[in-house]
Amino acid sequence: MHCDIYKFLKHDDMYIYIARPDYPNDTDEIKDWLGVLPKDFRAGLGRSKFVMHLDLATTPALARVDKEEVLAKLASQGYFVQLPPQDVMRRQAELHARESQDSIYNT
């Protein structure tokens, strides 16, 4: 299974894998590959940036996620969301809380 991987400027360390089951026969026309994402979810992501194209059949393992889980989600829904590690999410939440608190008390 081939897929494209995108990241989003609003969400550090979150990557979305988009299935490309017909690759390379699907390159004749320009297509909105992110169109498989639910509209509300996609709207909250902000601007996307293409990271890379990946052939999962020739990739032995993935760094942060289970390859079989990625393949299953790509086959069933057409995309897979790789969330940041818990420590990154915790740091982002703490930073956001501090910034919110600072804006309340420094006005």
From Swiss-Prot:
Which parts of the sequence belong to the YcgL domain? 1-95
Q: Which Pfam families match?
A: YcgL (PF05166)
Q: From which domain of life does this come? A: Bacteria
Alphabetized PROSITE patterns for the sequence: YCGL
InterPro entries reported for this sequence: YcgL-like_sf, YcgL_dom
* PANTHER family, sorted: PROTEIN YCGL (PTHR38109:SF1)
For this protein, the record's HAMAP family field holds: UPF0745
The protein's name: YcgL domain-containing protein Psyc_0800
Origin organism is Psychrobacter arcticus (strain DSM 17307 / VKM B-2377 / 273-4)
